[in-house]
Amino acid sequence: MKETFIHPTALVEQGVELGQGVSVGPFCHIQSGAVIGDNSELMSHVVVTGATTLGTGGKVYPHAVLGCDPQNNKHKGGPTKLNIGANCLIREGVTMHKGSDSARGYTSVGDNCSFLAYAHVAHDCDIGDYVTFSNNVMIGGHTTIGHHAILGGGAAIHQFVRVGHHAFVGGMAAVVSDLIPYGMAIGVHAHLGGLNIVGMKRSGMERKEIHNLRHAVRMLFDRTKPIRDRAKDVLTAIPDSPAVIDMIDFINVDTKRAYCTPPLDAVHGGAGHDSGED
């Protein structure tokens, strides 16, 4: 394993925990209490506060700022955290805030995530594994992003919104409602534009499951009954599909948000346009 390297111009305060093989580049500032995992690299001009844990194998590009106070007037300055998983790529100018003491108290990022330039993660968010934030993505506080979700450039996610796993948010979309697993949100404000077929195929999902999900979405969003009643009908019609069960479990969680739905004209013809062909 390579030796840990700290550039002479970097400021690493007493009380920082550096793993083996860490590289800290010019003009970085790592504050007391921070934990930097093995083989992580901070290129230059990176700020890591003492509230932050960065997992093994992370790579952080210039001018990223990790673990500063939440932009939340309810936060009173109590001890809170930012936890970032292993093998995360954090590009130039990315900002991630720690949790707030008026809520759960920590912001969490999973493993193998990519945050492209100037993306922002707000306080108390929960981000899964293998998530991609394209340039200038912004997510509000208390947002949940599921595993393998992809957020296109400039997308904005409202606070408390849930984005399901394997979902896709189009570039410049403004999402103010929960987005179902495997769903594709497009537009301002974003609507459900179909299913993320490309993402499902990339994940190795079988053709039968993709067809099950298409059938489920058509039933869920036909607007003839309340959505919870439609969810029961879906499980009756498609009882043995793990992907459909995931989607219905997502629908059945009580939250403060509505759901991304297809435009009215799309509902009459199905459930919008899928992001790919089957």
From Swiss-Prot:
GO CC aspect terms: cytoplasm; membrane
Source domain of life: Bacteria
Chief location category: cytoplasm
One Pfam family matching this protein: Hexapep
Alphabetical list of InterPro entries matching this protein: Acetyltransf_C (IPR029098), Acetyltransf_C_sf (IPR037157), Hexapep (IPR001451), Hexapep_transf_CS (IPR018357), Lipid_A_LpxA (IPR010137), Trimer_LpxA-like_sf (IPR011004)
Keywords tagged on the record: Acyltransferase, Cytoplasm, Lipid A biosynthesis, Lipid biosynthesis, Lipid metabolism, Repeat, Transferase
Assembly, per entry: Homotrimer.
Family: Belongs to the transferase hexapeptide repeat family. LpxA subfamily.
NCBIfam families per the UniProt record, alphabetical: lipid_A_lpxA, PRK05289.1
Protein name: Acyl-[acyl-carrier-protein]--UDP-N-acetylglucosamine O-acyltransferase
Gene: lpxA
